[in-house]
């Protein structure tokens, strides 16, 4: 089988932005799922955003990695266009909130408690993030789209996969591990 992951790092995402998970959810489900998974044939795809500011697009078992890279370059443009069309964001908001506050068994309560403690994120900060997502302003999402575009202009791609997949991507430099 062919397996590859095609991430890029978005350096300009504001680490303190509370709505980056919402932007990631919109891009993953309304755009990448259709163009990389359904049309491109990858087994999975998405845009992941962490509280640290680390953000990447990925695909899994992707037979068209070169095309996926081209689709990733359009994430910011997609988000801008999607917001201009005034789509209802309610489903994305609910989905994002459910990911941020899942039902937890005692083991997970301890695990997340440790995670929040070591990341210095208290209940007040969590509540502020939930409220920011519930009361999101489309202009805030447009700022994230702008940050995606700015970062993509600067380049920086990391690909992990088979030699044939990587060779098809016509990269300037390939480092073998």
Walk through the language-model features, giving the residues of each.
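C-terminal regions of mature proteins
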Residues: 1, 14, 93-177
């Amino acid at each position: 089988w062919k397996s590859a992951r095609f991430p890029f790092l978005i350096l300009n995402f504001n680490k303190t932005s509370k709505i980056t998970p919402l932007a990631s959810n919109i891009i993953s489900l309304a755009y990448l799922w259709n163009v990389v998974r359904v049309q491109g044939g990858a087994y999975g795809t998405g845009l992941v955003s962490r509280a640290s500011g680390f953000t990447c697009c990925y695909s899994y078992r992707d037979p068209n990695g070169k095309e996926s890279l081209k689709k990733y370059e359009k994430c910011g443009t997609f988000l801008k266009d999607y917001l201009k069309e005034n789509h209802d964001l309610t489903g994305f908001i609910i989905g994002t909130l459910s990911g941020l506050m899942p039902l937890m068994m005692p083991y997970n309560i301890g695990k997340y408690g440790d995670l929040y403690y070591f990341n210095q994120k208290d209940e007040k900060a969590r509540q502020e993030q939930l409220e920011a997502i519930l009361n999101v302003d489309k202009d805030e999402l447009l700022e994230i789209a702008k940050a995606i575009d700015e970062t993509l202009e600067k380049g920086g791609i990391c690909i992990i996969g088979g030699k044939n997949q990587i060779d098809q991507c016509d990269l300037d430099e390939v480092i073998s591990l």
